[in-house]
Design a protein with these regions (language model features):
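Domain-level signal for soluble alpha/beta catalytic cores
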Residues: 1-231
Length: 231
């Protein structure tokens, strides 16, 4: 039994990590009649798994997702290549389709969140760029909470926030304005100013703050001490 006042949480990778990423879906035709059949089965596997976590007591499931950071970087790299840009857009569309199908019909008292991760190995990162190129896709995803990295300039401006929020009153955008990569602490007034700036674009009641990522996305962790983390 879960103690009163405790919300059991499970974090898992997003199904988008399997869709046209690092050749993980190259062999789909060996097992499925069509690409859509593959996506549907992937969505069902995730749906059933999340439901199982719920049945075991979880009431908060978060899907960690590096695909959107990857797409941000790729859209920028290929902006002068229409053919490649179209391929990237198709990946984004397939991601939205699969994720939403996986989330459909889950219990209403289950909170569904995602963290848009850009990499966090030894205080470095994999991807950079603003959310502008993927905002319209994020705005279609049926999550309750979006954790968005915003700890430095590599994440771009707050301009895409209204598109991501998409006038959904129940959706919360949690802004990762506190870095977990660097032991130096942020100026409190500067953080407050940033939240007020975001609140000019999205209602304050739909905003939250957090660290941009965890302290250790891998065994090695970031370049800071345990005491730095508690500070």
């Amino acid at each position: 039994m879960t103690p009163e006042g405790i919300t059991p949480k499970v974090t898992i990778p997003s199904p988008s990590l399997i869709i046209n990423r690092d050749h993980r879906s190259d062999l789909y035709a060996d097992y499925y009649d069509s690409w859509t059949d593959f996506l549907d089965d992937l969505a069902k596997a995730y749906h059933d798994t999340i439901q199982h976590f719920y049945d075991l007591g979880a009431r908060y499931v978060q899907l960690d997702d590096t695909t959107w950071g990857y797409l941000i970087q790729q859209f920028e790299n290929e902006k002068n290549n229409p053919e490649k840009t179209a391929e990237l857009a198709k990946i984004a569309e397939d991601d939205v389709y699969t994720i939403n199908k996986a989330l459909k019909g889950l219990p209403e008292d289950l909170t569904l969140a995602t963290h848009i991760c850009r990499g966090n190995f030894k205080s470095t990162y994999l991807f950079e760029g603003g959310y502008d190129s993927v905002a319209k896709y994020l705005g279609q995803l049926n999550y309750d909470i979006f954790f968005l990295e915003y700890d430095d300039a590599r994440s771009g401006s707050f301009a895409p926030l209204p598109t991501i929020w998409n006038n959904r009153d129940h959706v919360e955008l949690v802004l990762g304005v506190i870095t977990s990569k660097d032991p130096n602490l942020e100026n409190v007034d500067a953080v407050i100013d940033r939240i007020h700036a975001a609140a000019e674009l999205v209602p304050l009641k739909n905003l939250g703050i957090s660290t941009q990522c965890g302290f250790a996305s891998s065994e090695e962790g970031n370049l800071l001490t345990e005491q730095d983390e508690w500070n």
